[in-house]
Amino acid sequence: MSLGLGLSLYSNAQIDKNATRETKALYHNLKKLSKKHVLFGHQHATEYGHGWSGEADRSDVKSVTGSYPAVIGIDFMGFSGRSPEDIAKSVATLRQNVIDTYQRGGVTTVAWHFSNPASGGGFYWKDSISVAAMPLIKPYGSHHEAYKEILRTIGDFAKSTKGQDGKLVPMIFRPFHEFDGGWFWWGKPHCSREDFMDVWHFTVSYLRDTLGVHNFIYAFSPDNKFTTEEMFLERYPGDDWVDMVGMDNYGDFGRDGKYNLTAGIQKLKIVSDYAQKAHKLAAFTETGLESIPNTTWWTETLLKALKTEKMRLAYVLVWRNDTRSPTHYYAPYPGQVSEPDFLKFYQDPYTLFENDLRKIYKKKFLGLF
């Protein structure tokens, strides 16, 4: 294969034409793997877990299966709205987390529970002093310069996170998630479609073109409030501004004891079908069942949904295991009632964990172990 042909494969539909070779390889290899597999992810998997925090070489998933999740979720929540000292600590801790995942061969995805930069409040609308900040942080808004400063912190982090090979670590960046709901200050009831898209366009262009961040894959992920492709794309910034399309969906997968797998599968298919049509990646960006009381949830609910309709999803990520709460967890730990079923989920050839991956950041992808 000629060098030119090889590079064209890796830049297919990626919105950053100057993305690093490792980022292009990750994009291409995720697309390739999604034809026959799905990577399993867990939010905050290595930072803390059920009853523990800050222990090296540990995750609840690893304690159960022997492998880390293939995808580790982190959060830029600590990069703003705090003292400079606390921000610096958060940056340093997350940097090491991302590097460690890269060194092991895993993948990092980044959520952003973004404290309201106009009110000084939290990321939930009710905690953000009900300030509609999206029109204020867009270009020419009253808090635009403050937003640029926050993005510079993210840009500096991205450009400082390097593996032992000296290469920048690729990350899937998923800003302004679940925007179709009203619980976050960037949610649909609190900003116009135009304001949302303007902020998205500025965020990508400022990071990519002004700050020179070239190790991000940009993911668009509403919650589950759509039933058609048109509704899914209602606030879509455009194919030139998105690398991955996804969905967060807890409601159709057992939340509060309510299941609507038919609806959940239909929505996942809308995501997968659009990705294939637009030559994008697709993912099930968040899901899970709190406390996992359903002993066969992993195989009879999640895996069954993922395998239906021959969808192409790069990964599925379940939410965090809180360190203090006895009930707020979404992945099993040793002795948890769904552990035997999770092991069946882990052993299924369709699901991939970190131990299954091989050279996912290399252009000459060698597949799986």
For each feature predicted by the language model, list its residue ranges:
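Substrate-binding cleft of secreted/luminal carbohydrate-active enzymes
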Residues: 34, 38-45, 280-369
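Alpha-helical scaffolding within the catalytic cores
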Residues: 24-26, 52-61, 92-96, 154-157, ...
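Bacterial Sec-dependent N-terminal signal peptides
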Residues: 1-14
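Hydrophobic faces of well-ordered beta-strands that scaffold small-molecule active sites
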Residues: 38-42, 70-74, 108-110, 171-175, ...
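Aromatic-lined carbohydrate-recognition surfaces of secreted/lumenal glycan-active proteins
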Residues: 41-43, 174-176, 200-230, 280-293, ...
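Aromatic- and acid-rich polysaccharide-binding/catalytic face
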Residues: 72-74, 232-261, 319-321
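Substrate-binding cleft of extracellular glycoside hydrolase catalytic domains
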Residues: 77, 81-204, 209, 213
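N-terminal module-boundary/linker segments of secreted carbohydrate-active enzymes
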Residues: 13-73, 77, 86-89, 349-369
